[in-house]
From Swiss-Prot:
It comes from Debaryomyces hansenii (strain ATCC 36239 / CBS 767 / BCRC 21394 / JCM 1990 / NBRC 0083 / IGC 2968) (Yeast). PROSITE patterns: RIBOSOMAL_S9. GO terms for biological process: translation. This is Small ribosomal subunit protein uS9m. The lineage of its organism: Eukaryota, Fungi, Dikarya, Ascomycota, Saccharomycotina. It is found in: Mitochondrion. GO terms for cellular component: mitochondrial small ribosomal subunit. Keywords: Mitochondrion, Ribonucleoprotein, Ribosomal protein, Transit peptide. Its main location: mitochondrion.
C-alpha cells in the first residue's frame, strides 16, 4: 500500500517528517557499515561522512598501515616473481643471453686469445637468425642487429685459446652452435703430452716432412738416429733448428728426437723447426703468441715451381735470336 492511499483513510494521521528522518537514519547506518568494511579490506582509514564537507576540520590519520598487512608472509610466498631479470625489457630472452655472454667476457678478460682461421669459421658456425628467432620466440621484436650483437660476443668468446678455455665457456658456445652443421663439423682436438711426457707434432717444409718428439732434458738433438752436428753440417741449418728455443729463451731445456724424410737439407731443417715450435706450444700454451709473432706457427708454403713446356726452367724463356 502506498503512502498516497493511506492519506485517503479517515482518522489516520501520518507524520511525513518522522518517515523522512527514519529513512535518512537507515541510509547513514548503511554508509557507516560500508565505510567500516572498506577500512577492514584496504587497511586504510577513510574520511568520516560528517567531515567530508566540513571546512577547517583537522583529521588525524595514522602514517603507517597495519602491521599485519605488512607481514603477510603467505602473500610473499605465493606472489609471482619473473624468472628473468630482464622480464620487463623489450626483448627479455635476448637481453638475458647478452647479459650472460658479457658476464663471461668480463670474467675471463685476462685469458690469452688467438686468431681464428677461416677454416675453423667455416666448420663451426653459430645459430642463424631464423633459428635464433624460433628458439627465443620473440617474434617481430628480434631484429638482425640483435643477432649480429649475439654473434659478435660469441666470436669474442671463441677467440680464447683452446688449451685455456674454461668449461662454462665451452658449454655456452655449444649451446649457440648451429645444430644443422654439427654433424659435418670436425671437433678440434687439443693436443696434450703422451703417457711418456712427450710432445709429438708434425712439421712440413717444401717436400720434407718431419715428425718431432720433444721432452724435458739438457739440450740434446737427434735427427734420424744421428747427432745434430753429424746430420746437419751446415751452420745455417743448425741455427734454424735452435731458433724456436731462442724465441722463448729456453735453450738447453729440452731434448729433440726427429724423424725426417724427403727434400733437401734446408727443407728438412725448417720442417724440424716448425715441429719444435708446435711441441713448445703443447708444453706451454702461453708461448703461442710469441712464437706466432716470430713466424713459427705458420709454415712457409712455398714450393719449387715446376718446369713448363717451351721454357728453359719454370719461367725462364730461351734466348731470342732474330735470325
Amino acid at each position: 500500500m502506498s503512502v498516497r492511499s493511506l492519506y485517503g483513510i479517515s482518522g489516520l494521521r501520518i507524520s511525513t517528517r518522522t518517515f523522512s528522518k527514519t529513512a535518512f537514519r537507515l541510509q547513514e547506518q548503511v554508509n557507516q557499515t560500508q565505510e567500516s568494511t572498506d577500512t577492514e579490506i584496504n587497511g586504510r582509514p577513510l574520511v568520516p561522512a560528517n567531515l567530508k564537507n566540513a571546512k577547517g576540520e583537522r583529521l588525524m590519520i595514522p602514517s603507517k598501515l597495519q602491521e599485519n598487512a605488512l607481514r603477510n608472509y603467505e602473500l610473499e610466498r605465493l606472489r609471482i616473481i619473473p624468472k628473468l631479470n630482464t622480464f620487463y625489457g623489450g626483448n627479455p630472452v635476448h637481453e638475458e643471453n647478452l647479459n650472460t655472454l658479457n658476464g663471461l667476457i668480463r670474467k675471463y678478460i685476462n685469458l690469452p686469445t688467438r686468431i681464428v682461421d677461416d677454416k675453423e669459421i667455416q666448420n663451426t658456425k653459430f645459430v642463424s637468425f631464423e633459428e635464433y628467432k624460433t628458439r627465443i620466440q620473440s617474434g617481430t621484436r628480434l631484429k638482425p642487429i640483435h643477432h649480429k650483437e649475439l654473434t659478435q660476443l660469441l666470436h669474442r668468446l671463441r677467440s680464447i685459446d683452446p688449451e685455456l678455455m674454461p668449461r662454462e665457456v665451452s658449454d655456452v658456445l655449444a649451446k649457440f652452435a648451429n645444430t644443422s652443421s654439427e654433424s659435418a663439423k670436425a671437433a678440434q682436438k687439443v693436443k696434450t703430452l703422451d703417457e711418456f711426457g712427450r710432445a709429438i707434432s708434425l712439421g712440413k717444409r717444401k717436400r720434407s716432412v718431419a715428425k718431432v718428439y720433444l721432452t724435458k732434458g739438457d739440450g740434446q738433438v737427434m735427427v734420424n738416429g744421428k747427432s745434430l752436428l753429424e746430420y746437419f753440417p751446415k751452420e745455417a741449418d743448425r741455427r734454424r733448428i735452435a731458433y724456436p728455443f731462442q724465441v722463448v729463451s729456453q735453450e738447453g731445456q729440452y731434448n729433440v728426437f726427429a724423424e725426417v724424410q724427403s727434400g733437401g737439407s734446408t727443407g728438412q731443417a725448417e720442417a724440424v723447426m716448425y715441429g719444435i715450435a708446435k711441441d713448445l706450444v703443447i708444453f706451454n700454451p702461453l708461448l703461442k703468441s710469441r712464437l706466432h709473432k716470430s713466424g713459427l706457427m705458420t709454415r712457409d708454403a712455398r714450393k719449387v715451381e715446376r718446369k713448363k713446356p717451351g721454357k728453359v726452367k719454370a719461367r725462364k724463356s730461351p734466348t731470342w735470336v732474330k735470325r
